[in-house]
Structure formats: structure tokens, C-alpha cells
């Protein structure tokens, strides 16, 4: 495993009474590092690791189950429809990993439910049922904001052959899940179609504060981008 941060959070989870063997966090970290070894479009291993770190920090403040939050955060993209459409519906890879490591049926159900609630799906997006789900959803959405969010947006757009910006292509809003997944637009439009909608979807107070700061940074960046696009000095 690379880096010391997961170890810090893992030890803290154990100290707070987590009932699952702490080695599963190590194994999950190694597992997702291998799964995403060839992913460079914004949903890579380092995205997963950032979501894990942020989710567990939020979970501490919200008194949520750190083990459930940590595992759901680490595994949240393993069966993502964009990356593994053949396993998406039943969370096959997530379930197989958890069963292999002795997770209870209740924990597997909880983690799979959280993962199913994470994604932004336009007007069909859901509010997680549990505080653990809210922590993971907030962490995943926070990683789409700020400086990292900008970099990820352009990395994803470039890897999928999207135009950075075209003033003649207007953003589409109020899309449902099907429309959102099928929609092809520019990377700049993605700011309006998704990224600038995330702040108001945050569930926890700590995430709301971070989201506001990061959104302001993105708006300042986009203003500068559009000025430079027009050749303004």
C-alpha cells in the first residue's frame, strides 16, 4: 500500500470500536489500486484515495461508522457503470471482495446501498438514507469541486474526446438520469450541468462549507478561462 494516510484512519477507526479486522482496509486499498491501475480519466486510484480520506474525516465529525464509510468510499467506483458496466447492476466485484473478507450480509447490503446512492444522476439523484451514505456521497462530490475538480473535469473530457469549450453549444440542465448519462457536451458546459449544482446537494455541514469555498474558486477560474477564450487582456 502506498502512503500513510489510510493507516492513520484505519487505526483511528479501530480505536473508536470498529468491529471489522482493520486489515480489510489495507486489502481494499490494494485492491482498488490494482483495479484502477490503467484508469487516467479522473476516476483513478488517487480519486478513490481522496474520497476515502475525506469521507472518513467527515464521518468522524458526524459520529458515523468508520468501517462502513471507509469501505464504501474505497469501493464506490469498482462497479461504476462508466468503468465496469457489466458488473454495475449487482455490484458483483464489490460483493465478491466483501464476501472474501468475511463481511456480514448486513454490512454488504449497507455498503452496496451506499454505493448505489453516491452518483450524481441529474434530477434523479437521491439523498442517502444513512449518515454513512451521506458522508461518502459528500466526499465523492467534493472531489469534483475546487482545483482538483477542475483538473478532473478536463482530464475526463480529454480522455473521452470532448471539446473544451464551444460557445455555440449551450449547457443542458434539469436532465434525468438517462438523459444525463447519454448527454455529450463540452467540458465547460459540464461545470453548469453538474459541478455548479453540487454545492446545494451536500448533506453535512462540514461538506457544505468546503463546497462553497471550492465552488467560488471554480467560478473565478471559469471567469478567467472565458476571458482568455475571447482573447481579452
What are these regions (language model features)?
Residues 5-9:
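Short polybasic linear motifs
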Residues 97, 101-137:
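Hydrophobic, well-structured mid-protein blocks that either form specific transmembrane helices
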Residues 10-19:
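Short, Lys/Arg-enriched N-terminal segments with co-localized hydrophobic residues
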Residues 27-38:
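Generic N-terminal amphipathic, Lys/Arg-enriched alpha-helix
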Residues 66-84, 90, 94, 111-121:
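His-Asp-centered metal-binding catalytic motifs of divalent-metal-dependent phosphohydrolases/nucleases
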Amino acid at each position: 500500500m502506498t502512503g500513510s494516510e489510510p493507516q492513520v484512519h484505519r487505526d483511528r477507526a479501530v480505536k473508536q470500536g470498529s468491529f471489522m479486522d482493520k486489515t480489510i482496509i489495507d486489502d481494499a486499498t490494494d485492491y482498488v489500486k490494482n483495479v484502477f491501475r490503467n484508469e487516467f480519466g479522473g476516476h483513478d486510484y488517487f480519486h478513490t484515495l481522496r474520497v476515502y480520506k475525506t469521507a472518513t474525516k467527515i464521518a468522524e465529525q458526524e459520529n458515523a461508522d468508520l468501517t462502513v464509510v471507509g469501505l464504501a468510499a474505497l469501493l464506490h467506483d469498482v462497479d461504476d457503470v462508466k468503468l465496469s458496466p457489466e458488473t454495475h447492476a449487482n455490484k458483483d466485484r464489490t460483493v465478491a471482495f466483501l464476501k472474501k473478507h468475511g463481511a456480514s450480509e448486513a454490512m454488504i447490503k449497507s455498503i452496496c446501498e451506499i454505493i448505489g446512492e453516491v452518483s450524481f444522476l441529474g434530477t434523479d439523484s437521491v439523498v442517502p438514507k444513512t449518515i454513512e451514505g451521506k458522508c461518502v456521497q459528500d466526499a465523492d462530490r467534493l472531489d469534483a469541486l475546487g482545483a482538483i475538480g477542475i483538473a478532473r473535469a478536463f482530464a475526463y473530457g480529454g480522455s473521452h474526446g470532448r471539446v473544451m469549450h464551444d460557445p455555440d453549444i449551450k449547457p443542458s440542465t434539469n436532465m434525468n438520469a438517462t438523459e444525463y448519462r447519454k448527454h455529450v457536451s463540452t467540458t465547460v458546459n459540464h461545470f453548469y450541468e453538474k459541478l455548479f449544482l453540487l454545492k446545494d446537494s451536500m448533506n453535512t455541514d462540514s461538506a457544505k462549507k468546503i463546497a462553497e469555498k471550492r465552488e467560488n474558486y471554480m467560478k473565478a477560474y471559469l471567469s478567467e478561462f472565458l476571458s482568455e477564450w475571447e482573447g481579452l487582456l
